[in-house]
Amino acid sequence: MADETRANVLLAVQELNYKPNAVARSLMNARTKTLAIIFPNVSDGFSGTVLSGVEDAAHAQGFSIIVCKTGGGRERTLDYLQLLAEKRVDGIIFASEVLLPEYATFIQKLRIPLVVLSGESSDPSVPTLRCDDRLAAYTAAAYLISLGHERIGMIYGGAYGTPEQNGRVRGFEEAHRDHGLALTEGQVQLMDGFAFKDGQVGGQRLLATLTDLTAVFASSDELALGVMSAAHARGLQVPDDLSVMGFDDLPLAEMCLPPLTTVRQPLYGMGRRAASLLLDHLQGIQKLGENVVFPTTIVERQSVRRR
C-alpha cells in the first residue's frame, strides 16, 4: 500500500471512529479473546472476590469474561458447557465445584484449556489451584484448642462429597486426635452449602444438642455468620459465651459485629493466577503445569476469646 493511500485510510478510520469487528477478527485468528468461569453460586462474597481477580487479569490482556452459575446441577452444567463450546471460548475456569469425569471429557474433546479453582478434579491431568484445606483447618482447630477450647463444633458445606473426602473436616479431626480430644456424634455438622442460612440451621443443631460447646469452626465466613445469628437467637453472646471462627476472610468478616476471626485464603490472587495461567498458555508463554497450592493465615479479630 502506498504511503499516501495508507495515510488516507488511517484518516478515514479516525474520522469514522472505526472499530474492528471482534467476531470477524476471531474468525481470522481462531480466538474469541474470551474466558469463561463456572460457579455453583454467584451471589456470595467468595465468587465476587475470585471473579474480581479473574476479570482484572483478563482485562489487562484484552480478554473478556463469561460467568456461568450452575447451582451445582449436572444438567445445567452440561448445558453451559455446550453453550461455551458454541461461543468458542478460549479457556474455562471451573470454580468451587467438583469437576466430574463427564465434564472433563466434554471439555477435553473440544481441546479447550481448563483449570480448576478451589474445587475438586476427578482428572489428575487438569491443573488445580487451591489452598491446603486439611492444613488450614488443622491450624484453625489447633488455634482454638491453644486458647483453651476443648469442645469445638464444626459446620461445613457438603459440596465436595463425604466427610472423609473433605480436607477441612480431615484437618479438624486430626487436630483433635493429635491433642488427645475425642469427637462425639453430631459435633461435625454437614450442610447442603456454605451460605448464611446453612450456618443458621447448623448452628441451631449444634447449640441445641451439644450445650457444652465453647467454640464453633465454620468452613466459610457466611456459615460463621449464620452460627453467630443462631447463637444470638438463643441468647448467647459472641465471644463471651461462644467463640466463632470462619474461613475465607471475605469483606463481610470485618463488617460484622463482632468482627470475625477467620482463616484467610487469598481469593483475589487465586482468581488472578487462574486467569493468568490460561492466558500464558494461550499466548504460548508456558504450558498449563502442576497444581498450585496457596498459603492460608489466621486473621485474629474479636469473635474468639481465650477460655
Predicted regions and their residues:
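N-terminal helix-turn-helix DNA-binding module of bacterial transcription factors
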Residues: M1-K33, R305-R307
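Bacterial carbohydrate/catabolite-sensing allosteric modules
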Residues: E15, D56-Q61, A85, K109-V116, ...
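Short gly/ser/thr-rich secondary-structure transition/capping motifs
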Residues: E15-N21, E75, A95-E97, Q200, ...
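Interdomain hinge and pocket-entrance segments immediately C-terminal to HTH DNA-binding domains
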Residues: P20, N29-S43, Q61-F63
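Short hydrophobic/charged patches on amphipathic alpha-helices used for structural packing
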Residues: A24, L78-L81, A104, A141, ...
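N-terminal winged-helix
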Residues: F39-D56
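Short histidine/acidic/glycine/proline-rich micro-motifs that form metal-
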Residues: N41-D44, G71-G72, G157-P163
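Central regulatory/effector-binding core of bacterial HTH transcription factors
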Residues: D56-A104
